[in-house]
Amino acid sequence: MAASPILECFQQEDLWFTAVVVTDGRGSPRKGLYAQYDDEQMRLVRFKEQRKAAVIGEYAALIMLDYPSKVIKDGRSQPPVEDLTAILTATQPKVVYTHNLADKHDTHVGVALKTIAAIRSLPTASRPAKLYGCEVWRDLDWMVDSDKVGFDLSPQENLQAALVGVFDSQISGGKRYDLASLARRRANATYFESHGVDTSTGLSFAMDMTPLIHSEDLQPLSFVEAFIQRFKQDVSDRVRRMS
């Protein structure tokens, strides 16, 4: 999800990437080697894989909050917001990357909403400069081009592959995230511009959610619905022009 900042900070002395894994991974699908793993075994192996990724990507820190998904999907649950607030206060990031509000995974949307709430709880001067919602369980190719934030992922495809490939419990366990994630980035790069040559070999899209941390009156639902409305209008206008 956050390949761009990982690459940006990799081997740099003045840039640092900190990863926060909010949930415990207990409910993940499994087969093959992991078919007989119970939820607690899956939790432990998922944590081990996150630590491996942190070493490969040379993260400054990896924080695992270990919440069950049901806690994150509960809009009234405040402990995750409090934990995220404490992390933001300690790390003071300039940019935060989380899930986008149009993601089709309930837990991911829950993480995004709690991240927004945590940032809003900070004093205005202590808030990050940018908040991006990234692609996972729904790509963002559907957004109109003027709404897309594109991150060039042309460099270090080997490192990107390693960062995804380390999650063997997911890949061997039945989900080919290694192939799908890199293929999506290449597809984004090729299909981004219909009348021009490719300018990158890999591209990820994000939703700029920064307005939500600057205006507490702006509701997340109305914010994401505006993206959908612009997409609807774009499609309608094109069909009318060609009719």
Feature map (PLM): residue ranges:
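Active-site rim/loop-helix segments in enzyme catalytic domains that contact anionic ligands
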Residues: 1-90, 121-124, 227, 232-242
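Metal-dependent de-N-acetylase/amidase catalytic core
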Residues: 74-243
